Amino acid sequence: MVKLFCAIVGAAGSAFPVDIDAGQSAGDLKDAIKAKNPATITCDAKDLQLSLAKTADGAWLPDDDQAALDLEDGKVHEDIQALIDGEKMKATWTIEDVLTANNMTKRKGRAPKSRQIHVLVVVPEGAFGSASETSKMDQLVEKVDKMYEQTVLGKRKYVHSEVTSTQGRQLLNDLDIRVEFVRTVPFDAGEGSSVDPYEWKRVIIENGEEVVLTEEQQRKRYRRYVEHNIGAVLKEKQLCVIGVERGTNILTVKVPGREIELAGRTDLLILSDLVAMRPTEVQYLPGVKMLIEVKRDVKASNDFQALSELIALDLLVDDPVMALLTDLKGEWIFFWVAEKINSSARIHKAAINKPGEAFEVIRALLVQPPTAPADTDTTEIKLPCFQSPVKRLKLRKALPPIGEGGDNGGIRESIERYYDIASMLGPDIEMARAVARQVTRSIPTFSYFS
């Protein structure tokens, strides 16, 4: 029998214990969690998402860690967000399978103990029960707050790891950016260096099943793989490869002149080796050349995460940069800000299928001079696998002029009136509902149902 301390993300309250046999499945654990929280969880148990609560070094999350304390208050710490954005527990795996695959066993000295958080529980939106009318009102007021930011203030926030295809297209539309695919040319036979694809490590768990470890479990290994294949250039140009997938949201920036904020981080950065000597200097992104977003399986929707990260990094630094989305095997997708045509900024995208060719491109990119000539906005560089010179432009010089915001008429007035009343008398749940209904009716897709 294993005692696991579980915490519901976004719901204030202490962690609660669940006793479960190691041979039972994660699906059984979902049933047990729901049974313990009938007033809090109103969805089917199968709809819960479970993640292990681990620290950056792979240990269990201590209950006095700031991330755990925030959980008690119903807040979502950035470390918790990174965990729930990552690997989920598969319902078909036994608890023993999960613990073994993550090196969280007695044999490894990491068996679950007291004074730790072990499982993070994510409940689908709208499936939280409510112990009081106050909590209902808090949730509704929070939604109106978000409506106020977007409708009256025109604010939008995009979190890189959470950007969906719809949100990604909205971001590109907000900034008038178009993405264009650029053809590449493979090397002729015998040209370039041959590099083996990265081998995603597998482990054999107790029942004999072979399991591929997740990106999170292999970060050090794939960082060393990248370093090994560009080591000579790193040394020559005094650069290094560092992992920034945990900790501070280093790629957080507000788009100049617009109420748009991009937030989050990426997996790897290639930048000045000063960071290797003084890790705290990473916050200034010295000499950064490119970011690398690693996915075990690259999907079309992952483009938008890479694009969001590229836009943020480009706005944060003075020199042109590139983004790479890759599975380190047969998908190496490069993105960069290329030019401005009419009023639209153009981000170019190119795909390479062989690791050897991709690393030739990376090495050629890293030896480029750091700054553009003073007398021109656009630079051109020659890279392997590209037929034509690669154009590069800073996004700040490509963004369209800031236009006047539209008039939302009654919606603005209603939300502003709500805030005026709430500031004097406190939140009013019925008025909040009315404002929410009005905003919903103003959205074409929902107007048919209101």
UniProtKB/Swiss-Prot annotation:
Record's signal peptide: 1-17
InterPro entries, A to Z: Crinkler_N
Alphabetical keyword list: Glycoprotein, Host nucleus, Secreted, Signal
Motif range (Nuclear localization signal (NLS)): 218-224
Effector domain: annotated span: 125-450
Region DWL domain, residue ranges: 58-117
Motif (HVLVXXP motif): 118-124
Keyword Lipid metabolism: no
Upregulation: Expression is constitutively high and slightly induced during the late infection stages (approximately 1.5-fold).
Entries under Pfam families matching the protein: Crinkler
Protein name: Crinkler effector protein 63
Source species: Phytophthora sojae (strain P6497) (Soybean stem and root rot agent)
